[in-house]
Amino acid sequence: MYRLPADQKLKCTEFMSITEATEAKAIQYLKDASWRTDAAVDNFYSNPSNFANKFDKKAIETIFNKYKDSGEEQISEKLPEFVKDININDEMMELAVLWKFKTKQMGVITKNEFMETMERLRCDNISSLEKQMETVRQQLSSKDLNNNSAFKEFYMFVFDLGKAENQKNVSLQMCIELWTIVLKSKFDNLQIWFDFLNKHHKLAISKDTWNLFLDFVKIANDSITKYDSEGAWPVLIDEFVEYYKENCK
C-alpha cells in the first residue's frame, strides 16, 4: 500500500475504479499527468499494452447505429434516449456526456466523436460507458472546487459549447442558463450574480470573464472579503463585488 496525501489517494481510487488497473500503475499514470485524473485515464486508454482483450470496434458502431439520426452520421434526435440508457437523468450530466465525447455542437455527437471517444474510453458496450459516466458524476459533484481539475476542464468546455456559430462570446441568457446548470450547487450567491448581470450588464459574456468567474467563486465561497480588487480580474467581477457590498450586507 502506497502512502499518499488524501487528495492523491482519492484520485488513485477513482483511476483504479475506472480502469481496473493496479495501484502502482494508477500512481504511475497520475504522476505523469500531474495528478489530473481525466488526463491520466486518457493516457492509460491510449496505450494498447494495457489491454489483454481485443477491443470490439464493430460493437461500438452497432451502438452508434442504434441511436444515430435517420440519414445523418450523428446522434441528435435520439440523444435523449442515449443518455437515458446510460443512466443520465440531469442537465449537468447531459452536458458532461457532451464533454466526454468532445463535441463541437450542443446536442449533437458526430460519428467520429462517438467512435473516437468510445475507443479512447475502451467502452464497447453501454454498461461500461455507464460505469465511466458514474465516475465522471462523482468527480463533477464534488463541492471542493480548489482540488477539482476535472470540473474546471468541464466548466471551460461548457462555455465553448454555448457559443453561437462564428461568435467569440456567449449571450448573457445562455450563460445564465449554463451557470444555473453547472454552478447551482456550488455557489450560494449565484442568484445575486444573475440579478446584478440583468440590471447592470445585459451584454454577452467573454471567455475570459467566464473562466475567471470560476476562480472568483472559489474565493467567494470562502469569504468574499478575501477578493483582491487589485488583482487581474475582469471589470465586471470588480463591479459585482461592489454591488454585493452595497446591497447584500
Curated annotation (Swiss-Prot):
Pfam families: Cullin_binding, UBA_4. Residues 55-245 form the DCUN1 domain. One of its GO terms (biological process) is protein neddylation. Residues 4-49 form the UBA-like domain. Keywords: Ubl conjugation pathway. GO terms for cellular component: ubiquitin ligase complex. GO terms for molecular function: cullin family protein binding; ubiquitin conjugating enzyme binding; ubiquitin-like protein binding. Transmembrane segments: none annotated. This is DCN1-like protein 1. It comes from Dictyostelium discoideum (Social amoeba).
